[in-house]
């Protein structure tokens, strides 16, 4: 279990600290304190269930950004086999903020693409904190075209604060790269299944999330701008980010209600970072089911299905 608790989890953190203290005492004592430990563990679980049953939108944003949340390579390691990473956009450079390559899912060849954030400072800098430059999106598009050529289903994993807004990225055509991905993904003649596993920020997320199915983990978010950015525009202060998060309706359950997301995938109690294996197994089963649904479609049906799904967004329900 993670030891990195968020502010709203402090009551849980205090209980977990007591449990850990008792465990250490028990190792050095002849007194049996197992019953007390079990009582506190049950209390901790009950408290966690209570807190997580009524999370605010801002608290969900914090969970989506949790530094110990599983990233792309954590899922690749647990869901896919024989992964072979492919590099470069064949035009400018290899952007480490987006990674992708061929792999096997249930023994069948697929293409896997996603944003990758870093764990330590060195990797965060190398991955640009999960904010892709244009060459990252062009690399992703190159891999998608390759997948289409060889008839491989495409699985994308979205986890980015947004596309990198630096001068160099803009000079090299950031907006063009994103727009081209949107247009070409809509026409791909292979199954495309997209999953938001953390942050789904703005065009940086959209550029690899045009699919036949869009899934979200329960404590992930998907929006046109960050809460801090929205608050800075509306109220001239990023301190009202919590209000912005609530107004933007960026949490998975609400987006599912609005018809933007096709499926919300449950997370382990306390969030995906509490149990990587359980989260990966749940996601694997969801991806397997969604692939079975779209895998029977012909290329023409896949394109039509994608167009219909996108056209339905924003239409009145019922």
Curated annotation (Swiss-Prot):
Which superkingdom does the taxonomy of this entry point to? Bacteria
Tell me, in one coarse class, where this protein mainly resides.
Answer: cytoplasm
* An annotated Gene Ontology molecular function: ATP binding
User: CoA carboxyltransferase C-terminal domain location, by residue?
Assistant: 32-293
Q: What class of enzyme is it?
A: transferase
- Alphabetized UniProt keyword annotations: ATP-binding, Cytoplasm, Fatty acid biosynthesis, Fatty acid metabolism, Lipid biosynthesis, Lipid metabolism, Nucleotide-binding, Transferase
Could you tell me where this protein is found in the cell?
A: Cytoplasm
Matching InterPro entries: Acetyl_CoA_COase_a_su, ClpP/crotonase-like_dom_sf, COA_CT_C
Q: Name one GO biological process term.
A: fatty acid biosynthetic process
* This protein's record includes keyword Lipid biosynthesis: yes
Keyword Isomerase in record = no
Tell me which EC number(s) this protein carries: 2.1.3.15
- Specify the pathway: Lipid metabolism; malonyl-CoA biosynthesis; malonyl-CoA from acetyl-CoA: step 1/1
Give the reactions, separated by semicolons, that this protein catalyses: N(6)-carboxybiotinyl-L-lysyl-[protein] + acetyl-CoA = N(6)-biotinyl-L-lysyl-[protein] + malonyl-CoA
Q: Which GO terms describe its cellular component?
A: acetyl-CoA carboxylase complex
Give the similarity note: Belongs to the AccA family.
What quaternary arrangement does the UniProt entry report? Acetyl-CoA carboxylase is a heterohexamer composed of biotin carboxyl carrier protein (AccB), biotin carboxylase (AccC) and two subunits each of ACCase subunit alpha (AccA) and ACCase subunit beta (AccD).
Q: Outline what the protein does.
A: Component of the acetyl coenzyme A carboxylase (ACC) complex. First, biotin carboxylase catalyzes the carboxylation of biotin on its carrier protein (BCCP) and then the CO(2) group is transferred by the carboxyltransferase to acetyl-CoA to form malonyl-CoA.
What PANTHER family does the record tag this protein with? ACETYL-COENZYME A CARBOXYLASE CARBOXYL TRANSFERASE SUBUNIT ALPHA, ACETYL-COENZYME A CARBOXYLASE CARBOXYL TRANSFERASE SUBUNIT ALPHA, CHLOROPLASTIC
Q: Which NCBIfam families match?
A: accA, AccA_sub, PRK05724.1
Q: What is this protein called?
A: Acetyl-coenzyme A carboxylase carboxyl transferase subunit alpha
Recite the lineage of the species: Bacteria, Pseudomonadati, Pseudomonadota, Gammaproteobacteria, Chromatiales
């Amino acid at each position: 279990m993670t030891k990195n608790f968020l502010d709203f989890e402090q009551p849980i953190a205090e209980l977990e600290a007591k449990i850990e203290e008792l465990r250490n005492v028990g190792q050095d004592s002849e007194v049996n304190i197992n019953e007390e430990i079990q009582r506190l563990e049950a209390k901790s679980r009950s408290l966690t269930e209570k807190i997580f049953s009524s999370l605010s939108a801002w608290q969900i944003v914090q969970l989506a950004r949790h530094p110990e949340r599983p990233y792309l390579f954590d899922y690749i390691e647990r869901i896919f086999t024989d992964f072979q990473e492919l590099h470069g956009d064949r035009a400018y450079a290899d952007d480490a903020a987006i990674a992708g390559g061929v792999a096997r899912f249930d023994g069948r060849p697929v293409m896997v693409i996603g944003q990758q954030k870093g764990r330590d400072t060195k990797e965060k800098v190398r991955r640009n904190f999960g904010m892709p430059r244009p060459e990252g999106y062009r690399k992703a598009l190159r891999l998608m075209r390759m997948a289409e050529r060889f008839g491989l289903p495409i699985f994308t994993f979205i986890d980015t604060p947004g596309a990198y807004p630096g001068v160099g990225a803009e000079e090299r055509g950031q907006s063009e790269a994103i727009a081209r991905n949107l247009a070409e993904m809509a026409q791909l003649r292979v199954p495309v299944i997209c999953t938001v596993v953390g942050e789904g920020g703005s065009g940086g997320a959209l550029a690899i999330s045009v699919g036949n199915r869009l899934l979200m983990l329960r404590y992930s978010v998907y929006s046109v701008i960050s809460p801090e950015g929205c608050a800075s525009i509306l109220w001239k202060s990023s301190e009202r980010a919590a209000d912005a998060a609530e107004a933007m309706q960026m949490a998975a359950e609400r987006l599912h209600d609005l018809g933007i997301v096709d499926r919300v995938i449950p997370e382990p109690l306390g969030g995906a970072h509490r149990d990587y294996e359980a989260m990966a197994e749940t996601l694997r089963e969801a991806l397997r089911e969604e692939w079975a649904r779209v895998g029977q479609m012909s290329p023409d049906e896949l394109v039509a299905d994608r167009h219909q799904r996108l056209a339905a967004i924003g239409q009145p329900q019922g």
